[in-house]
Amino acid sequence: MKKRIPTLLATMIATALYSQQGLAADLASQCMLGVPSYDRPLVQGDTNDLPVTINADHAKGDYPDDAVFTGSVDIMQGNSRLQADEVQLHQKEAPGQPEPVRTVDALGNVHYDDNQVILKGPKGWANLNTKDTNVWEGDYQMVGRQGRGKADLMKQRGENRYTILDNGSFTSCLPGSDTWSVVGSEIIHDREEQVAEIWNARFKVGPVPIFYSPYLQLPVGDKRRSGFLIPNAKYTTTNYFEFYLPYYWNIAPNMDATITPHYMHRRGNIMWENEFRYLSQAGAGLMELDYLPSDKVYKDEHPNDDSSRRWLFYWNHSGVMDQVWRFNVDYTKVSDPSYFNDFDNKYGSSTDGYATQKFSVGYAVQNFNATVSTKQFQVFSEQNTSSYSAEPQLDVNYYQNDVGPFDTRIYGQAVHFVNTRDDMPEATRVHLEPTINLPLSNNWGSINTEAKLLATHYQQTNLDWYNSRNTTKLAESANRVMPQFKVDGRMVFERDMEMLAPGYTQTLEPRAQYLYVPYRDQSKIYNYDSSLLQSDYSGLFRDRTYGGLDRIASANQVTTGVTSRIYDDAAVERFNISVGQIYYFTESRTGDDNITWENDDKTGSLVWAGDTYWRISDRWGLRGGIQYDTRLDNVATSNSSIEYRRDEDRLVQLNYRYASPEYIQATLPKYYSTAEQYKNGISQVGAVASWPIADRWSIVGAYYYDTNANKQADSMLGVQYSSCCYAIRVGYERKLNGWDNDKQHAVYDNAIGFNIELRGLSSNYGLGTQEMLRSNILPYQNTL
């Protein structure tokens, strides 16, 4: 039995099977120009019973045993065709067989083809009963796909299921180019299993052999097969030389895994990255476990830590079972706060301030749903590791619509908050929220009147440390009951734009909302889960200023806004603009002295927001938004982008984003917003571009500049060359990777990456632009 040892060579050939890049139609069509296609009518089913047709210039024989055909001999049966200068037909009776065995020997310019392969050589043999075929000292070419080579002997077996090569070679390069090839003493291609087995395999670049393996198994189709994927290498200032060698494991039809040894020179060890994917009756999920046994750099930088092991565990699951049960997991945990600064990972970033660990189980039937969940946070700040977790939380909703003209709902929540620090307050919170709605609507407008009661009870513990250090004392038991009343009206007006743009339609959509919530002093309640909600135009019409339930601001306000849209004759939205404001009749308060703007006693028009989108053409788009808050005395946030996009490989985008330091302080958790890099807010201008610059060459670049710090924030440049049988990519990235508190400046990481992949084994001809765009620390977002 021949020993089977998976080797690195499988990596270099199997890559196309697992690639997720899109198609580059131009390159794909160019590559297929050199590939033969099957141009005869395809015969379906069993072709062995079909008649054999023989055409030749001359024929002679001893009927019925032997016959010799010479001169342009052409033999056809079903999808198979054999041509040669001379063919000798032999027919013999076989004991126990109803039909005689018919074989042919072919000499001179032998050409065999069917809908799978073309074989050419000076000598051939075929069994017309079984379709077994031999061709000696010739070459072969796959039909309808890239793949060709040579062999001392080429055999078709198993009714064209197997192609067997003795001392053969394989390459996906087009005729005239042997950039790479695989040579083996025996190659067996199984079309049903979509796998090729190669013994004594040598991988060649041009005529030079560079790698040997006694056995190689590689996928040659879309069927999942275990094997090595393409290796990657890069150099970074954080880890120096890095090398990845991923292995794909097809465990079962409903589960697979990718195991990647990741060598990092500076760390002095190999990180094992293990990604597991599964599909079950309870849903689909993905798990990732990365483990570095020891890290010499971390050990030097943190001598007081008992262990230098670094690890990450990620689990994402979502599923429904029996149509009523819902299961969700969103769990990320790392060994230490510096993990995402030291290692690139798609499940977290150096700009993240925390990792979330959330589990939930839900039950839902008509008019009712309930969810039990737990939520924890791992804070990465070394200055303040305080954070609250919900252990556990119960949410219940009951709906009953069409109660006369009304819709009703009752929402309830019970949650227990625990802090990571022993001296911080903890609480059990119970909340009940009955709601009644009166919805009225017609073709041109709607009005929704809503009333609800917000009743919350707190039982707070562990208050001694906090109360001893603050003037405002927390209460062990606190109740808060407040009604809420809201009226929300909308109208939609529509007109044809025949004078300016025939076929176009414009809408005018005014909206007005009145909201009333009485003031309740919440200073005796600690803030466990509330923060200021980010606002855009639609956010102006929210009921709440804060997320969570610990801070419910009073409201006596009117929100007004208007949206206008323009649709073309194909009902595609070409333009929209929205502008709105909140007018406060009385100040919005919670009684919390830590909220600075509550001390201003401001009323009137305090918050403005606007959004716009303009699809100038099918290739040009403009998008922007702004929020102004007089309580912050400045623009709170703004963003804008303009983009030209010809297709997924040809695009240019300019963008700008801004967030004031006051806004960041108000919206983000305290342990996150006090980080030094956010004290001046965010003000970044950037550009992203992707374009094929020459035949088969493409380039991707991104550059972001921090106008507050007057320095580069992030940049990336990638270049890829793509051909029909290989692609090479080189990339450079400089990105923000944390903050040095001692030196009070940002820390950057520089990375140079190199990647090579073999093409032609699948339909992947992507130019690599989408993958390079996604790799940036600020990923590209489509404006159109």
Swiss-Prot record:
Keywords: Cell outer membrane, Disulfide bond, Membrane, Signal
One example of a Gene Ontology biological process annotation: lipopolysaccharide transport
Disulfide-bond pairs as recorded: 31-724, 173-725
UniProt superkingdom: Bacteria
Database matches in InterPro entries: LipoPS_assembly_LptD, LptD, LptD_C, OstA-like_N
Record's keyword annotation contains Signal: yes
Residues annotated as signal peptide: 1-24
GO cellular component, one term: transporter complex
Subcellular location: Cell outer membrane
PTM: Contains two intramolecular disulfide bonds.
A Pfam family matched in the record: LptD
NCBIfam families in the cross-refs: PRK03761.1
Quaternary structure, from the entry: Component of the lipopolysaccharide transport and assembly complex. Interacts with LptE and LptA.
Role noted for this protein: Together with LptE, is involved in the assembly of lipopolysaccharide (LPS) at the surface of the outer membrane.
Annotated family: Belongs to the LptD family.
Protein name: LPS-assembly protein LptD
